[in-house]
């Protein structure tokens, strides 16, 4: 019985589990998809900057300004996520890509805000 499980059922389960992941595309974006990722990242950065500038006179804490801007601009990255998932890319990979774009733009915004606040004093 042990040999039947090891040599019959285990390979079948392995093939089934591999087929579950085979339906997703790889990370090889088409030119249009790559351009959409680049544009969405730029739009997100622009949105963060515009939102932060509108809040800079009302708040004196850079972290609060950055948090508000990130919440206000989250829809840009959500649309990118939805598009790539609907284009049949793995949701985990898309989540990492979108998270990386978000982190990069947010860290840059926070750095710029802190620099601006220091110059303002």
Regions found by a protein language model. Give the residues of each.
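N-terminal signal peptide c-region/cleavage motif recognized by signal peptidases
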Residues: 15-19
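Short N-proximal segments of mature Sec-exported proteins
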Residues: 32-81
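Cleaved targeting-peptide boundary
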Residues: 21-29
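Hydrophobic alpha-helical membrane-embedded or membrane-associated segments
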Residues: 11-14, 71
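Charge-enriched, low-complexity helical/IDR scaffolding segments
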Residues: 24, 46, 119
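Compact alpha-helical subdomains of small soluble proteins
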Residues: 63-121
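Bacterial N-terminal signal peptides that target proteins for export
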Residues: 1-9
């Amino acid at each position: 019985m042990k040999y039947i499980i090891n040599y019959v059922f285990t390979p079948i389960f392995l093939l089934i589990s591999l087929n579950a992941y085979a339906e997703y595309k790889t990370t090889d974006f088409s030119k249009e998809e790559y351009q959409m990722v680049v544009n969405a990242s730029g739009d997100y950065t622009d949105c963060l900057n515009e939102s932060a500038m509108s809040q800079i006179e009302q708040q004196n804490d850079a972290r609060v300004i950055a948090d508000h801007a990130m919440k206000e601009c989250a829809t840009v990255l959500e649309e990118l996520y939805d598009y790539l998932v609907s284009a049949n890319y793995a949701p985990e990979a898309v989540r990492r890509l979108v998270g990386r774009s978000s982190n990069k733009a947010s860290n840059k915004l926070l750095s710029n805000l802190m620099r601006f606040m220091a110059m303002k004093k």
